[in-house]
Amino acid sequence: MTELNEEATVNEIEQEVQEQQEQVSIPHIPPRPTRHSPPAIDPDQSTSTSNSTNHPVIPQRPTSRPTKSQESKIPQQETPQETQELSSSGKDESDSSAKQNFEIPVIPTRPSRQHSEEPIIPPRPQRTTSQEPVIPIRPESTKSHEDKEEKPISEPVIPSRPKSKSNKPVAPSRPESSKSVEPEVPARPTRDHLTEPEVPLRPVSSREEAKEGLDNLIDQLEKDLSETVEPSVHAPIEDEDESPIEPVPSASGLRLPSEVDQQQESEIQEETNAIAEGQLNSETINSSNTFGDGEVTPGNSTTKTSFKSDEDEDDEHANHLGTGGDSSSFDDDVETISQEQEDHLEEEQQQEQQQEQEQEQERAAPVVQSLGTAIEEDDQAGGDETDTERAEAPAEEPVKEEPVKEEPVKEEPVKEEPVKEGLIKQESKPVIPVIPSRPPKKASLSRSTTEEDSIGLDQSKPNINKPIIPKRPTTESLKSGDESTSSQTQQPSIPVRPTKSNSSTSSGSSETVTKSKPPPPKPKKLSSKIAAFQQQLFNPMKSGSSADEDENKGEGEQPKPRKAVDSSKFLSRFGGNAIPLPGMFNPGQIPMHARPSSTTKDDDNDDDKEEQGSSRSVENAPVRRTRGPRGKKLPKAVSEAKVESESKFCLESGELFGLVFTKKVEESVDGLNEEEVAHKSLEEEVTEVNVKPEVASKTVEKQEEEDDIIDEYEKDDDIVEKDEPKSENDVAKEEVIEAKIDESVTVPGEFKEDTKEEEEEKEEEPVHRIAVSTDSRESPIEEEEDDDIVIDKTGEEKLNSSNSSLVDVKQEMEDELSKNDEML
C-alpha cells in the first residue's frame, strides 16, 4: 500500500509539472535581468520587484513546512522554472536559468522524502479498525441476552434448552465415552423402533446410506472377482454370495460377512487356477480407493508383497506343471479384501450407534427439561432453589453469570443418560424418580458460592434493585435528617466524624461535642526551611496553647490566671533543661516542661489547683489511651523481683583518741620528796584511754604527744637564762646523759602494732622518751608502762644550762619526727 501511494503522488506531481510547462507565461521574462542590471524599463521594474521578491523566498520555505501544504505550493515554485526554459534571449537570463536549474532537483527530492513518510498515516486507522469490531460485539451479546430473557416469558420452557445444547461445542466429546459402552449394549437398534414415530427421518436416512454403501462394496467385489476368475468358476460364486450377504444390513452390528468369506475361500481354492500377482495387487489397490480410507500400503495390509522373488518362482513352476501353485497368494488377497470389508462395516456401525445415541439424548432432553421445571416448582415451594434452575424459570430476570454456570452443570447428567438408557430401555415413567436426584448435585455447587443470592432472587423483580439503589441513600438520609442542625454549621469536609460519635453517644452530648472543637486551622505552606525554622523559634507553643485554651473554655472551666514569674528563675534553669543557648526563648515562649515550680507555699497551692483543673479537663477530653499487647504477662521472677542496693563501703565507728584537761600541780613545800611529786604529776597529767580504737593505729597518738613535747621545749627556750659556770661534775653528767641518749633504749609495748618492715627501718634510730631524775644524777632512765614520759623542771634547767647539748637533742628529735612522718 505504501508503494502504491508513493507512485500515485509522484505521477500527480509529474502531470502538474507538464501542464505548467505547456502554459507559457511571457510577462515573467523581463524581471530576471532587472536583478543584475537595475537600469531598465520602469513599468517592467514594477512587475520585476514583485516577482523578484517571490523567487528567492517561496521555493525555500515550503521545503521545511509540513507535507500537506506542499502540493498547493509546488506549482508556485515551478512556474518560474517554465519561464526559465522558454527564456533564452539574454546571457543574464541564461545565467539565472542555469542557477535555478541547479535548484530544481533539490525541490522534488525533499517532498519525495516527505511523501515517503506520508504512508505511515494509513496503517494507524487500520489498527483502530481492527479494534473497532470489539465494540459492537458487546451490545450484540446484550441483545442476545435480552432475546433470551423475552423468549421464556412468551414461549414454553422446552424449546429454549435444545438451542443452548445445539450451540455447545462439547457434543463431540460425548460419543468417546459411549465407545467404551458399545460392546455391553448389543440390542440398541431394537429400541430405536420403539421411538421411531417421534423422529422417523434420522434413523431411516442413516440405515439406507449404510445399505447402499454395503451394496456398492459387494458389487465392486463381484466385478473384481469376475475380472480375475474364469466365468465357469465365477457363476456358482455369485449364487452363493447373494444368499448370505442380503441379510447383513438387518443384523445389528454382528460380523456375519466373516463366515461368508470363509465359504468363498474354501470354494475358490478348489475351483480357481493360478493368476498373476500383479493383476491382483493392482485390483486390490483400486478397490481400496473406493472405500475412502486411503490407499492400501504394505504396512497397512497383510499381503505378502515382500516375497516377490519366491512367488515368481512359484508362478513359473505352476505354469509348467499346470497346477495351482499360487493359491496361497490368492488366498492372502481375498483375506485382505474381507478384512477391509469388516473394518468398514465396524466403522459404519459405530457411526450409526453414535447417531442413535445423539438422537436419544435429544429426545430425552425435553423430557428432562419438563421434569426439571416440575422439580423447580417444588423447590420454589420449599425454598431450595439453585442459581441454574432460577435462570430457567420464565418469570424471573436472568443474571449474566447464570448462563455461564448452566453449561458445565448440564454436561454431567447428559453423559450419564446413555448408560442409564441402556439399562432402563427409555421408559418415561420409571425415569422420573431417577432425575430428581440430580438437582442436589447442582445445589452443592451453587451453595458453595452464595446462599444470600439465592434467597434474594426468589423475590420479585423490584426486590433485586432495591438493595442497590434506594437503601444506600436511606441510611445517609436518616443520619442527615436527625442531625441537620449540627451538620449545617460545620464545614462540608468534616460532617462524617460527628455522625460516628453521635451514633455511640446521646443526642444531647452531640451538641456539646460539635461546639467544643471547631475545625483546626490549616497550616500555611512554607516557602523555605528558613521560614520553618523561624516559625518554630517565634511561635513554638502558640498553636498548642490556643487549642488547649479553646478546649477548656468550651467545657465551661475557667482556670485562674497564672502569676507572673521572675526572669531570674528562668535564667537559673537554662543550664539543665537541654536548651542550647541562653536567651534563645523569651520568658513567655519557654516550653511548659521547662518552667520551674515556685518555692513559696502560696505558689504551691495555686499550682495544685491548676493541676487539678487540667487533670479534669484531660479526663473529660476524648483522648485514646495507648494500650500494650494483650495477653502477655511478665514472668513472676521479673515482675516480683526485689532489688537490694548494697554499697561497696563499710561504715565502722570507734573512738580514736581522748583528751583530759588537768591543772598543773605546784611544788610541795611540806618536805615531800621530789621523786614522789614527779610520780604523782605523771599519774595526774596522763591518763590511759579505757576504750581502745578499733581501726585507727597508735601512731597518730604518738605524733600528737611528740608535738606537744616539742612545743613545751620551744616555750622554754624563749626564756633567756644566765649562763652559769660549769663545774667538772656537771660536764661529766652531761656526757653520761648524751651517752645514754645515744644508746637505743626502747620503751616496752610502744611499737607492738607496727609491721616487721617498719620495725626493721626503725632499728637504726628509734624514737626515745627520756625521764631524768632530780635527786641522783647517776640513776638510770626510768621506763614507764604508760608510754608517756614527763621531764621535771630541775632536769630541764640542767639540760638547758648548756646550749650545745640542747641543740643536739632538738635536732635529733626533729629528725626522728620527720622520719616518722615519711613512714606514715
UniProtKB/Swiss-Prot annotation:
GO CC, one annotated term: actin cortical patch
Q: Where are the transmembrane segments?
A: none
Taxonomic superkingdom: Eukaryota
What ranges does the record list as Acidic residues composition bias?
A: 343-359, 375-387, 703-721
Low complexity compositional bias, start-end: 75-89, 499-516
What are the Polar residues biased-composition ranges? 44-74, 279-291, 533-546
The ranges of region (Disordered) come to 15-645, 694-824
Which residues fall in a compositionally biased region of kind Basic and acidic residues?
Answer: 140-153, 205-226, 388-428, 553-566, 722-743, 790-799, 809-824
Q: Where is the composition biased (Basic residues)?
A: 624-635
State whether keyword Cytoplasm applies. Answer: yes
Localization, per the record, is: Cytoplasm, Cytoskeleton, Actin patch
- Family to which this protein belongs: Belongs to the AIM21 family.
Protein's name according to its UniProt entry: Altered inheritance of mitochondria protein 21
Gene that this polypeptide is encoded by:
AIM21
